[in-house]
Amino acid sequence: MKVIFTQDVKGKGKKGEVKDVPVGYANNFLFKKNVAVEATPGNLKQLQQQNKHAEQEREQEIEDAKALKKKLEDIEVEVTAKSGEGGKLFGSVSAKQIAQALQKQHDIKIDKRKMDLPNGIHALGYTNVPVKLDKEVDGTIRVHTVEQ
């Protein structure tokens, strides 16, 4: 019997997958636990529409990420920090501070965890900070660290 999985079932199938399973297993386990439905023409068509809709949403997310990447290339974020001699900072500028400055100065909200800045910025001047905007789209934020 062909079934469409509505949830992941360990060792059997993932959500949205169409598989052949024994009739008894389908009737006594999958249907009773509501983890699968029978693969009727109507259900298959509905699954196809859901997949198409999900694909369109994914394409829109990628387009939005590319637009944000282009916007980030054209701007600069200015962060102030206390520094000593030679342009060395007392402490460092963190991803959280950069995210807050980006929100305040340009009204762009980016999660600090998406910034690839493991040790922070330790010197005055310009720094390019890599940002993971999407699984497929990476960008950079140009950060200008100035003395307070």
From Swiss-Prot:
The lineage of its organism: Bacteria, Bacillati, Bacillota, Bacilli, Bacillales. The gene is rplI. One of its GO terms (cellular component) is ribonucleoprotein complex. InterPro entries: Ribosomal_bL9, Ribosomal_bL9/RNase_H1_N, Ribosomal_bL9_bac/chp, Ribosomal_bL9_C, Ribosomal_bL9_C_sf, Ribosomal_bL9_N, Ribosomal_bL9_N_sf. GO terms for molecular function: rRNA binding; structural constituent of ribosome. Belongs to the bacterial ribosomal protein bL9 family. Keywords: Ribonucleoprotein, Ribosomal protein, RNA-binding, rRNA-binding. This is Large ribosomal subunit protein bL9. Binds to the 23S rRNA. It comes from the Bacteria. PROSITE patterns: RIBOSOMAL_L9. It holds the Pfam family Ribosomal_L9_C. Residues 46-65 are annotated as: Disordered. Residues 52-65 have a biased composition (Basic and acidic residues). It comes from Staphylococcus carnosus (strain TM300).
